[in-house]
Structures are given as C-alpha cells and as structure tokens.
C-alpha cells in the first residue's frame, strides 16, 4: 500500500471540500476503495460510485485489466450548515516513518491518552487503521482485537 497515494487522496478531498465541490473523482484502487468506503460508512461522504474519467456509470461496467486505467471512484462530499463535514484529513503514518500500534495502545488512544505523539481521538473524528491489508476504523480494529498501522485522522 502506498501512503503517498493515500496522502494525495486526503489532500484532494480536503481541497475539494474547502471549495464546496459536490462530486469529485479519485483513482480506482483497492486502497482508495477501502478508504472511501470507510469515510462513507462513518458519514463523511454522501455517495460513492464507480465510474470512468467522464463521470459516474449509469450502468454496471466490470473492471478489467483492459479498462482499469479509465476507472475512477466518484465521491460525493457532504456539507452541513454550509460547512464541509470533511474539514481535515491528515496522515499519521508517513511513508518514511510508519506507526504500528498494538491493540492495547489503540484502546488507550480511544480513551484519551496520547500514544507516541498521536493525540487522542476526539468526538467527530475518525482514525483509520490498516490491519491484515484491510482499512478499518480504529474502534472496529479494537473490537476485532487486531494490531495495525495507524494511517490517518479525519475530522
């Protein structure tokens, strides 16, 4: 998994939400799909659709090695009281210094303790973790008793 691509996606979504774009696209990869799906599940995004470079698909199109370069994920951004729901998206693990935490440290992080210079989880925030090549919310990783790499914080 490339943290550089995740950083680019975070910056893109953050920039689009600041200029009040309703619909934007990100590259179609497993990483981006899992990342966007978690944001959608947690209520930061209004919609998530597969599509091409021209826009979201009206009919189902299977992704194959021949058309993968033209496939995109179309993401609908959410706004509340004319303010973006997704206001900040920042990497915690960097490409040159990845941060892996055991489940016990993740529990402490969720309960208000600073761990390895990572500020505790605040209300309305989401910390995404990669465990066993899946991206999930930190609370989901704790409930499944998994250790993992702390990827990013979304506010």
UniProtKB/Swiss-Prot annotation:
It comes from the Eukaryota. It is found in: Mitochondrion. Transmembrane segments: none annotated. GO terms for biological process: mitochondrial translation. Keywords: Mitochondrion, Ribonucleoprotein, Ribosomal protein. Pfam families: Ribosomal_S8. The keyword Nucleotide-binding does not apply. GO terms for molecular function: structural constituent of ribosome. One of its GO terms (cellular component) is mitochondrial inner membrane. Belongs to the universal ribosomal protein uS8 family. Component of the mitochondrial ribosome (mitoribosome), a dedicated translation machinery responsible for the synthesis of mitochondrial genome-encoded proteins, including at least some of the essential transmembrane subunits of the mitochondrial respiratory chain. The mitoribosomes are attached to the mitochondrial inner membrane and translation products are cotranslationally integrated into the membrane. Component of the mitochondrial small ribosomal subunit (mt-SSU). Mature yeast 74S mitochondrial ribosomes consist of a small (37S) and a large (54S) subunit. The 37S small subunit contains a 15S ribosomal RNA (15S mt-rRNA) and 34 different proteins. The 54S large subunit contains a 21S rRNA (21S mt-rRNA) and 46 different proteins. This is Small ribosomal subunit protein uS8m. It comes from Saccharomyces cerevisiae (strain ATCC 204508 / S288c).
